[in-house]
Amino acid sequence: MEWIKELYEEQNGILGYRQMTITVNRRHETHFNKKRIRRLMQILHLKSVCRKKKYNYIKSTPEVTAENILNREFYADAPDEKWLTDVTEFKYYVGAEVKKIYLSAILDIFDRRIVSYRIGTSNNNQLVFETFNEAVANNPTAHPLFHSDRGFQYTNKTFHNMLMEAGMRQSMSRVGRCIDNGPMEGFWGILKSEMYYLRKFSSKEELTKAIEFYNTKRYQLKLKCMTPMEYHSAAAA
């Protein structure tokens, strides 16, 4: 039980019994099952934070639209076959002042890693374009199916041309169907519920650290109890 208490405190209370089971077994080379860990956490009165779901829609007149080619096929046989993207809002606090920031990110379905991201003070085309350019620069041979919602940045003709020049096919969620971009929504849920809602960010750098933690230190059951970057490296070996 000491291991559980130590990990719970170390991770600021973000670990539910499933994540706790994976982390205990990875750290201590044990084979506890999730039922036992759940029971021990109940005895210790340890609970993880619950996720909050928020759906925001921005009306716009699209210049370019695409079919939902992804069609909720949330799996891939190798890295860089399918990328998902989205933008979401965060806040951080400098004294009593509240500052809004926006996170644009691209996620690989295969290993659930964040391929690239950008943090900005405005939810605009430039934020999305820079995120995409970074992903292409770091993965010049990648030509994935590129899926997004129908936000104004992604229905922009300039962005569509950028995708075509990079040799990527464009796919878009149906109107009002957040589940069509499910893994991306799942990433937002993890980031916000485990690393954001628990405390107030005091700088943009804290958001950067949270993303790096997700990519390199957060184990996932669907990734054979590896982190996204571990799973990515194993596939490339």
Language-model features: where?
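Basic, flexible linker segments flanking DNA-binding modules
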Residues: 1-78, 177, 227-236
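Conserved, non-catalytic sequence blocks in retroelement Pol enzymes and Pol-derived host proteins
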Residues: 10-13, 27-29, 74-76, 93-94, ...
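An active-site-proximal beta-strand-loop segment
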Residues: 72, 76-115, 122
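C-terminal domain-tail junction helix/linker
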Residues: 157, 164-168, 190-237
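RNase H-like polynucleotidyl transferase catalytic core
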Residues: 50-55, 145-150, 164-183, 199-203
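Active-site beta-loop-alpha junctions of metal-dependent nucleic acid enzymes
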Residues: 99, 118-139
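Retroviral integrase
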Residues: 81, 113, 121, 133-137, ...
